[in-house]
Structure formats: structure tokens, C-alpha cells
UniProtKB/Swiss-Prot annotation:
Any GO molecular function: structural constituent of ribosome
One GO-annotated biological process of the protein: translation
Name of the molecule in the record: Small ribosomal subunit protein uS4
Keyword Translocase set for record: no
Family to which this protein belongs: Belongs to the universal ribosomal protein uS4 family.
NCBIfam families in the record: PRK05327.1 (NF003717), rpsD_bact (TIGR01017)
Gene name as annotated: rpsD
Key words of the record: Ribonucleoprotein, Ribosomal protein, RNA-binding, rRNA-binding
Organism of origin: Natranaerobius thermophilus (strain ATCC BAA-1301 / DSM 18059 / JW/NM-WN-LF)
Amino acid sequence: MARYQGPVCRLCRREGTKLFLKGERCYTDKCAIDKKAYAPGQHGPTRRSKQSEYGMQLREKQKARRIYGVLENQFRRYFREADRKKGITGQTLLRLLETRLDNVVYRMGFAASRAEARQFVNHGHIMVNGKRVNVASYEVKPGDEVVVREKSRDIPRVQELKELAEGYRVPEWLEADHENFTGRVVRYPEREEIDVPVEEHLIVELYSR
């Protein structure tokens, strides 16, 4: 399955909530869902029909996939891995998604969106423990150091992000020094620290059918 290349604002409208896929734009009055709080393809707001149980489970899975930019087969593999591990499956699933390298780069404030973070990783701008890593799905672990390559720090967009990061609150499970483009994974995130609008138990129910 190919990665979605269309207008990402349509995805937020489809899910009926902000997925923060557009970086800075999501925090302004230009955000599409603030102007058109109804699904794409409709000519104005209408009452949403009541979804079936399966429909709600499917929508929740799609929402999580879109937030993290993960393809269907990848997402299914994450679920299988979470299901094998000890602990609550849904929370473990979110933890696996949160510890993807592209997400960590985004959470540290080195990119304005997960899509931009994924691009930075793919283009070789990110290093983990002193080695360049260009795989967005790379799983980081507590103690890992994540930095922007020294040669990449003078890129105009990287400098712009440095200014945008002023006042940005880094999650407590991470550390980030925006002045020096360095960060560290302190520990794994707790569920209450993962601020995504996802009801993970519905995803577990979907894959358990």
C-alpha cells in the first residue's frame, strides 16, 4: 500500500479532530478543520450517522495510522509485537509508535511535524548514538542520544525550526537542547504522556475480532 500523498488537512476533517499533520499551520486560524469542521466531500456540516461498533474501531485504527504516518502492514506488525509483549497491549502499541525515530525527532522539537521529521531522517540529517540513521521506523531506547548532524545544522529550515522551538515543551520522557540540536531519550513514555486523540482499546478490539 502506497503512502498517502494527498492534502493532509482532508485527513483531519475525515477523522473529525486535529491530527497535527501540517506543522505550524495546525496552530493557526488557517487550520482547515477550524474552518470546515465536517468531512471532505460534504457541502456544509451535516449530522454524522451513528457508526457501528466495527466502524468506530476501524476509524480509531485509521486515526492512529494517520497520526504516526504508518502504513497498514507496518501498523499490523506493531500490533503483533505489542500483543507478544508483557503489559497492556494498547498502551504497548502506542509506546512502540512513540519510540519511532521520526516521532522522537518531532517530539524533541527538531521538526514541526512527523512528516517533516520522517523526511529529515530519510535524508540522513539525524544521528543516533553518533551514527547516522536514515530509517524512520528505527526504535529508540532509553539512553539513546538523538542529534541533528553537524553538517545539517546550517540548513535554513533547521535554523528556522530552532527559532520556532523557543518555548516548546519537550515531553518529560525526553530531553532536548535546541541551541545545540541534541537530545536524549530518558525513559519510555507513560500513557498519560502520550497526547494523541486515540482510544487504543478500540484498536485492540478490532484486531481481536
